[in-house]
């Protein structure tokens, strides 16, 4: 099952040329770009490991693509995402975030329903155990 997080997650995986164009869009807007990776893509895990520092003041997406290639070389077995941070007054937040790398074996999650007191229902997202191959 394909993990869907961030922009473009409903589309086929982006090619490097498409990633380059999205990064160039971020830079044209004056956003800082950063690369992050994780082996725990749980929807509530918002704190991914950063690959280096955020890239401020870049003019060309080639620098980001070079760092992405190195991150893929080291952490190609994990999820990698690119984010564009807008520091302008009134925003000061991530404006775009999308996956640029997936591990060979995707993580799977399921929604567990639990009835609790007062006829309330509680839902929890849990990671499914990997399927065993016989």
UniProtKB/Swiss-Prot annotation:
GO terms for biological process: reductive pentose-phosphate cycle. GO terms for molecular function: ribulose-bisphosphate carboxylase activity. Pfam families: RuBisCO_small (PF00101). It comes from the Bacteria. Transmembrane segments: none annotated. Keywords: Calvin cycle, Carbon dioxide fixation. Gene3D superfamilies: Ribulose bisphosphate carboxylase, small subunit. Heterohexadecamer of 8 large and 8 small subunits. The basic functional RuBisCO is composed of a large chain homodimer in a 'head-to-tail' conformation. In form I RuBisCO this homodimer is arranged in a barrel-like tetramer with the small subunits forming a tetrameric 'cap' on each end of the 'barrel'. RuBisCO catalyzes two reactions: the carboxylation of D-ribulose 1,5-bisphosphate, the primary event in carbon dioxide fixation, as well as the oxidative fragmentation of the pentose substrate. Both reactions occur simultaneously and in competition at the same active site. Although the small subunit is not catalytic it is essential for maximal activity. Belongs to the RuBisCO small chain family. This is Ribulose bisphosphate carboxylase small subunit. The lineage of its organism: Bacteria, Pseudomonadati, Pseudomonadota, Alphaproteobacteria, Hyphomicrobiales. The gene is cbbS.
């Amino acid at each position: 099952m394909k993990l869907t997080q961030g922009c473009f997650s409903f589309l086929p995986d982006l090619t490097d040329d498409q990633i380059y164009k999205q990064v160039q869009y971020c830079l044209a807007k004056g956003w800082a770009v950063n690369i992050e990776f994780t082996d725990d893509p749980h929807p509530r895990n918002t704190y991914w490991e950063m690959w280096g520092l955020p890239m401020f003041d870049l003019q060309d997406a080639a620098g980001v693509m070079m760092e992405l290639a190195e991150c893929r070389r080291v952490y190609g077995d994990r999820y990698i995402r690119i984010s564009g941070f807008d520091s302008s007054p009134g925003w000061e937040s991530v404006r775009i975030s999308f996956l640029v790398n997936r591990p060979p074996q995707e993580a799977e999650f399921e929604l567990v329903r639990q009835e609790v007191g007062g006829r309330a229902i509680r839902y929890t997202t849990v990671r499914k155990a990997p399927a065993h191959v016989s």
